[in-house]
From Swiss-Prot:
GO molecular function: ATP binding; ATP-dependent protein folding chaperone; isomerase activity; unfolded protein binding
UniProt protein name: Chaperonin GroEL
CDD domains with a match to the protein in the record: GroEL (cd03344)
Localisation per UniProt entry: Cytoplasm
Entry's Gene Ontology BP terms: protein refolding
Native organism: Anaplasma marginale (strain Florida)
EC code(s) of this entry: 5.6.1.7
Amino acid sequence: MANVVVTGEALDKSIREVVRILEDAVGCTAGPKGLTVAISKPYGSPEITKDGYKVMKSIKPEEPLAVAIANIITQSASQCNDKVGDGTTTCSILTAKVIEEVSRAKAAGADTISIKNGILKAKEAVLTALLSMKREVASEDEIAQVATISANGDKNIGGKIAQCVREVGKDGVITVEESKGFKDLEVERTDGMQFDRGYLSPYFVTNAEKMLVEFENPYIFLTEKKINLVQSILPVLENVARSGRPLLIIAEDVEGEALSTLVLNKLRGGLQVAAVKAPGFGDRRKDMLGDIAVIAGAKYVVNDELAVKVEDITLDDLGTAKTVRITKDTTTIIGSVDSNADSITSRISQIKSQIEVSSSDYDKEKLKERLAKLSGGVAVLKVGGSSEVEVKERKDRVEDALHATRAAVEEGVVPGGGAALLYTLASLDGIKGKNDDEQLGINIIKRAVCAPIKRIIKNSGSEEAPCVIQHLMKQNDKELIFNVDTMNYANAFASGVMDPLKVVRIAFDLAVSLAAVFMTLNAVVVDVPSKEDTAGGGAAGGMGGMGGF
């Protein structure tokens, strides 16, 4: 391999080309009339999706420079996906527009730093203007409307998500999984709990695409102690390994030799295992482990006071669950198989009694948090269909709608269909740059905030975007939007065309920040195959699809 440094016009041209390719592929999915994208797989049938992030991740250019640029953009999109689970398409459209405008300005000889200062100044004004337009989401109908919009107008998905929120509360745990039946969508409420602790090592991951640990019917081992040596829990590991089922370890910590041994065992294809830290601290950790034990039906939480030794613990003494899902930040236990409603009800009554007698506001608050986790349960949205392709496409839409709903409940909603960003134009009129190039940066953002609504209207098959923008900007009602479903103007909140503020805000913020990175990017160092590498790879010629290996 040899290193090549790419600079100047060659670099700018590559950036423009990669951004255009990504925006063309991702942008076509925007809006209720957006199109789907087929992603080919090495094995099996192609995946059909409208998930912008999934489309972006699947694009892998051949040229090393294009790969480097695409990776920078995809990493930014992944931040948007991690923070709100939605908004990747909007982020892509905005990024493409800003970079396109900046490239023109640079070609005309404008000062990059001044442009950047103008863009960042305009960014703050746009974010402030978005906050002034927000409305809180209160009713079940509004929740259903937000979910419906994010699910590309599928009212069934919107209604089911609203049902889940009603059953487990706005802060409750809602998960999505594939159904084995043919029903489009069904809701199942079950016992369960989620807490804010993720896997202790990414090597535990079983779903590499989503960076998740997913276990079906696992055993759960609970301990208040630190696990430094695998020898201390070896009897439990051996018993579970013989059963052929996965194991989740919840402990104060798992570190050193114990963690490395568990990881090595997993990588070698042995026991399916994952370890997470127990939630809380001190006495609160002890109480929360007790709550998890009740949910999972575990007989013991191992500690120094327990008379039973680890080697005496049988499989019947461990907790169980139907499903466990672990991300880098959270652990969700769904549907304990063995726990019964009586033990959970008894635990809930005990916590309620503690709340009544507690004189500390802080203690009461923490007890109420525990009560909510125990009593809320988990709502499971089961997605079905007549084919694997259909199920996966629908599941993507359900997950996007669920993320959008959570964001809407958290920060409120703004007018949808790209109207909220369009209405921030008024806030930019009063901002003046220190010089012509800084003003150019402000004007670039003015053009960028019009890009999402233009793309949504274009995807509907209409060429009326300029007329729509002109009409919306001439009137004073910031709740008026253009509904591409009906091709008419309507009130955003009455018609249900709303976007979560958090999604719009983060998508815009990340898009501008990403564009700012490319603005000051002067060189990219890439590895390119040397002649010797090419000759060596060619020795295996004739092996179609092997990529030279």
